[in-house]
Curated annotation (Swiss-Prot):
PANTHER family: TRANSCRIPTIONAL REGULATOR MRAZ. This is Transcriptional regulator MraZ. Gene3D superfamilies: Transcriptional regulator MraZ domain. The keyword Methyltransferase does not apply. Forms oligomers. It comes from the Bacteria.
Length: 149
């Protein structure tokens, strides 16, 4: 099962976010107790089921002689990772540091991204969807992916 779709949500006053039912089901099926890792990157908060995150960390640790930029990336992404667990109501708490990084105040958009999901501030996400994506079709075609909608 993969994370798919978009959902608009609001954080409660304690910074907790109610995940969509299908996201909760995926977390519960892939991680004992619904454990997940939240990290910051790309102007949003990313959520991974714990086993998927651990696999990512293992792969990352096998890099031979990583560049300074790669080490800085690791500092940002792995250094900001926080182990979380869904509460009894299917909520996850978003830390202040993640909220600050992603510009999250209250209203958010959750986006399924396959093996992970992203949590975006509503305003930042609105800026993404208004972009012109005409050049993306050519980039996909260069990668052997035809997007025929």
């Amino acid at each position: 099962m993969l994370f798919r779709g978009r959902s608009h949500r609001s954080l409660d006053p304690k910074g907790r976010l109610m995940l969509p039912p299908d996201f909760r089901d995926i977390l519960m099926s892939r991680a004992e107790g619904g454990k997940l890792v939240l990290t910051s990157f790309d102007d949003c908060v990313m959520g991974y089921p714990l086993p998927d995150w651990e696999d990512f960390e293992r792969k990352f640790s096998t890099l031979k002689n990583p560049s300074r930029k790669m080490r800085d990336f690791r500092r940002l992404v792995i250094g900001s990772a926080e182990l979380m667990e869904l509460d009894g109501q299917g909520r996850v708490r978003i830390s202040r540091s993640h909220m600050d990084y992603a510009g999250i105040t209250k209203d958010v958009v959750l986006l399924g991204q396959g093996s992970r999901f992203e949590i975006w501030d509503q305003g930042r996400f609105d800026g993404i969807v208004t972009q012109d994506f005409d050049d993306v079709a050519a980039e996909l075609a260069d990668s052997g992916i035809e997007l025929s909608l």
